[in-house]
Amino acid sequence: MASTARKTFEINNNVQVVDPSAAIFQYSREEEKLLDDEAPWRTDPHYFHTVKISAVALIKMVTHARSGGIYEIMGIMYGKVRDGTFWIMDVAALPVQGTETRVNAGNEAMEYMVNFQTANAEAGKGELLRGWYHSHPGYGCWLSGIDVNTQLNNQKFNDPYLAVVIDPNRTVSAGKVEIGAFRTYPEGYTPPATGNSQYQSIPMDKIEDFGVHANAYYPLKVEIYKSKLDEKMLDLLWNKYWVATLSSNSLVSNLEYSTSQVQDLNAKLRAASQSISNSSSKLKLKPTQPTTKGKETTEGSDKKLKKGEKEFSGVEEEETPLNKVTQESSRITSEAENGIISQLLKEKLFNTPLTQSVDDKSAQATVQGRY
């Protein structure tokens, strides 16, 4: 069962296998120093575009983030950089003072970082400090104003440096790790205009902080990898992660999170209702595309249009407040259903007497939520 769950975890998070003999695993301080001297990221704010995180580091970060509960946690990441890509190979949790909305690294954490780096060097691990991670329990993966300032300072004095954010609550609810990686722009830099990015749910009380600093940083593509050399460590880490997952009840452990999501949804519905009355006057009609160039007949219609007339096929979809609320409502419902189905499966698995067996129809009905 544990092996099946691990395979499911790897599929959900698209874990890729990397050859352990690849050049990236052969550390060269001279190569790192040469890249540091060239520092192409100083002239190109978008030089870094991808971060590859080892499965070992990912499970460590998720386990650490979940242990913090409603409070933020913080840790550091070690690895290398090559061809515009961060390779994160290991992480370490920091002893920090966290709250529900922020986390601060004090003198104790700084001393721990120095000692950890020294111990790594003595153990023959030459990877350098390449970033930090922290959690946003229940409010998504993005950088707040404090996070942006922290990352700006890190990039000034420790570049190349990366910021990673994990949402443990949404990870538990959805099954897939909710993670984001970011780099800040230099002060005074104006990023180029981009199209609408993928929508993510931000609580009402965080939207202002999110919007004010949204153009101060950019996201990197996150990929997860593992090698055959990681198998033993993954087995040990997975046993701890799997037991914690199996013994927990997301409906109970995420009760406060689920309640806050419903309350936030209610607030957004109230805000969206105020704009509905004026929405009909702002609808944009979608013109029908002609089937052949130069002809005035349109697809699905034999009607000939007069000169100057246009035919429309519907209304263009727009990202309205009501559309966003609908997406959030669907997500909350899906997460609740997943939690219920998970508990039903555990009940069938562990509470069925040994003298009985679970028939195929009953098992299928449980998976489909028809208990």
Swiss-Prot record:
Cellular localisation: Cytoplasm; Nucleus
Comp. bias regions, Polar residues: 323-333
Cellular component terms (Gene Ontology): COP9 signalosome; cytoplasm
Keywords for this protein: Cytoplasm, Hydrolase, Metal-binding, Metalloprotease, Nucleus, Protease, Signalosome, Zinc
Keyword Zinc (UniProt): yes
UniProt subunit comment: Component of the COP9 signalosome (CSN) complex.
PROSITE patterns, A to Z: MPN
GO BP of this protein: protein deneddylation; proteolysis; regulation of cell cycle
Protein name per its UniProtKB record: COP9 signalosome complex subunit 5
SUPFAM superfamilies: JAB1/MPN domain (SSF102712)
Free-text function comment from the UniProt entry: Catalytic Component of the COP9 signalosome (CSN) complex that acts as an regulator of the ubiquitin (Ubl) conjugation pathway by mediating the deneddylation of the cullin subunit of SCF-type E3 ubiquitin-protein ligase complexes.
GO molecular function: deNEDDylase activity; metal ion binding; metallopeptidase activity
Keyword Transcription: no
Domain MPN: 51-188
Stretches the record annotates as Disordered: 278-333, 352-371
InterPro entries linked to this entry: CSN5_C (IPR040961), JAMM/MPN+_dom (IPR000555), JAMM_MPN+_peptidase_M67A (IPR050242), MPN (IPR037518)
Native source species: Cryptococcus neoformans var. neoformans serotype D (strain JEC21 / ATCC MYA-565) (Filobasidiella neoformans)
